[in-house]
Swiss-Prot record:
Physiological role: Plays an important role in the de novo pathway and in the salvage pathway of purine nucleotide biosynthesis. Catalyzes the first committed step in the biosynthesis of AMP from IMP.
Catalytic activity line of the entry: IMP + L-aspartate + GTP = N(6)-(1,2-dicarboxyethyl)-AMP + GDP + phosphate + 2 H(+)
GO molecular function, one term: GTP binding
Residues that hold IMP according to the record: D12, E13, G14, K15, N37, A38, G39, H40, T130, R144, N226, T241, R305
Tree of life domain: Eukaryota
InterPro entries: Adenylosuccin_syn_GTP-bd (IPR018220), Adenylosuccin_syn_Lys_AS (IPR033128), Adenylosuccinate_synth_dom1 (IPR042109), Adenylosuccinate_synth_dom2 (IPR042110), Adenylosuccinate_synth_dom3 (IPR042111), Adenylosuccinate_synthetase (IPR001114), P-loop_NTPase (IPR027417)
PANTHER family per UniProt: ADENYLOSUCCINATE SYNTHETASE
GO cellular component: a single term: cytoplasm
UniProt binding sites for substrate: V301, T302, T303, G304, R305, K306, R307
Record bears the keyword Repressor: no
Subunit text: Homodimer.
UniProt name for this protein: Adenylosuccinate synthetase
Organism: Komagataella phaffii (strain GS115 / ATCC 20864)
Cofactor-binding details, from the entry: Binds 1 Mg(2+) ion per subunit.
Length: 428
């Protein structure tokens, strides 16, 4: 059976730390969607590891790690990230595997991404993409013109010729679309001949890999990237990523059935942040927002961009819970609220004089809602050294209990600091 860790907001909730804690007793950790547009930071014994594409389970020396078929992979970035974490002392030998069905991100995908974003910026409709080529790669996947890992590594006769043909067509299509598009086929082929041999030892049939693990009753943890509000179907479209970031993406990205899922853990930051463009009802463009940003060190792991900050939005969390079916929640970064005299939680929206308790799909309406808040007294004390949930200040527990009651899902963990030791487990 597989447990799943999913982001419940707009990403950057701190999923990596929960994955790190859970991986201490896990046999397999798998990524199911997204690419290196995501970012997790894990601190182990004072050493900081930044994960973008690779599964966070690599910090556990006994855990095998899979990049599933729903992930899109930029091979140069894959090897750069692998080298970076190995240089910090992680031995990944024989523990990292890549699905033969995963699609490849090429340099021209990344250039296309940036050119499209520049065009949108001129029309003031910028999405705020990371520029990593994720969207254009999923576009070629959907149009059935993409290149998968097996196209690159296959030893079948004429397989390299097919790879050349596919790559040539993709490059020519972009040259026709962008007259100034710079991408040389021969240099790309030379680069990928080298990468072909480097990636081969990592490649597996991910369907067989996952189902063997399920059959052998291995403990499996699936690490979702991004978050539900960035889902291509259920997020604040078009200000979303290009994959299914909810529970559906777990099934399609790994090729496992619903009955293989056990627990679904929703990770919730104690306030709300968002990177890039798009609606954000509880955003605080004031001293409170600046304080959250400063104390929370709210900068994107992947882009370095400053995150927009606001109060916790329970309309968003309730919506996310309905879709993903969380069995329990992990509240992160509660300590960021330590110095606030008052703390607010958004509980409903009002649009054109009417109360709205569900999340609107119409962004025009969403941009005009007024948020109804419940105000809580702060605890105004340092909680970073607290080791047991029961020892949290009374006002902190009231804040957490309100969240539980509103979304009707128990809180299982509370984060009170950056390290893996700063995770309080609550009896549920």
């Amino acid at each position: 059976m597989a447990d799943v860790v999913l982001g419940s907001q707009w990403g950057d909730e701190g999923k990596g730390k929960l994955v790190d804690v859970l991986c201490e007793d896990i046999d397999v950790c798998a990524r199911c969607q997204g690419g290196n547009n995501a970012g997790h930071t894990i601190i182990v014994k004072g050493v900081k590891f930044d994960f973008h594409m690779l599964p966070s389970g690599l910090v556990n020396p006994k855990c095998k790690n899979l990049i599933g078929s729903g992930v899109v992979i930029h091979l140069p970035s894959f090897f750069e990230e692998l080298e970076a974490i190995e240089n910090k002392g992680l031995d990944c030998t024989g523990r990292l595997f890549v699905s033969s069905r995963a699609h490849l991100v090429f340099g021209f995908h990344q250039r296309t991404d940036k050119l499209k974003e520049a065009e949108l910026h001129e029309t003031k409709k910028s999405i705020g993409t990371t520029g990593k080529g994720i969207g254009p790669t999923y576009s070629t996947k959907a149009s059935r013109s993409g290149i998968r890992v097996h196209h690159l590594v296959s030893d079948e006769p004429d397989s390299w010729k097919e790879f050349e043909t596919r790559l040539s067509r993709l490059i020519e299509t972009r040259k026709k679309r962008y007259g100034h598009f710079d991408c040389d086929l021969e240099s790309e082929l030379a680069k990928y001949k080298v990468l072909r041999e480097k990636i081969k030892p990592f490649v597996v049939d991910s369907i067989e890999f996952m189902h063997d693990a399920i059959k052998d009753k291995k403990k499996i943890l699936v690490e979702g990237a991004n978050a539900l509000m960035l889902d291509i179907d259920f997020g604040t479209y078009p200000y979303v990523t290009s994959s299914n970031t909810g529970i559906g993406g777990v099934l399609t990205g790994l090729g496992i059935p619903p009955k293989a899922i056990n627990n679904i853990y929703g990770v919730v930051k104690a306030y709300t942040t968002r990177v890039g463009e798009g609606p954000f009802p509880t955003e605080q463009l004031n001293e409170d927002g600046e304080k959250l940003q400063t104390i929370g060190c709210e900068y994107g792991v992947t882009t370095g961009r400053k995150r927009r900050c606001g109060w916790l939005d329970l309309v968003v969390l309730k919506y996310s819970t309905l879709i993903n079916g969380y069995t329990s929640l992990n509240i992160t970064k509660l300590d960021v609220l330590d110095t606030f005299k008052e703390i607010k939680i958004g509980v409903s929206y009002t649009y054109q004089g009417k109360r709205v308790t569900t999340f609107p799909e119409d962004l025009h309406a969403l941009g005009k809602v007024d948020v109804e808040y419940v105000t809580f007294p702060g605890w105004e004390e340092d909680i970073t050294q607290i080791k047991n949930y029961e020892d949290l200040p009374a006002n902190a527990k009231k804040y957490l209990e309100f969240i539980e009651e509103y979304v009707e899902v128990p809180i299982q963990w509370v984060g009170t600091g950056p390290g893996r030791e700063s995770m309080l487990e609550k009896n549920i």
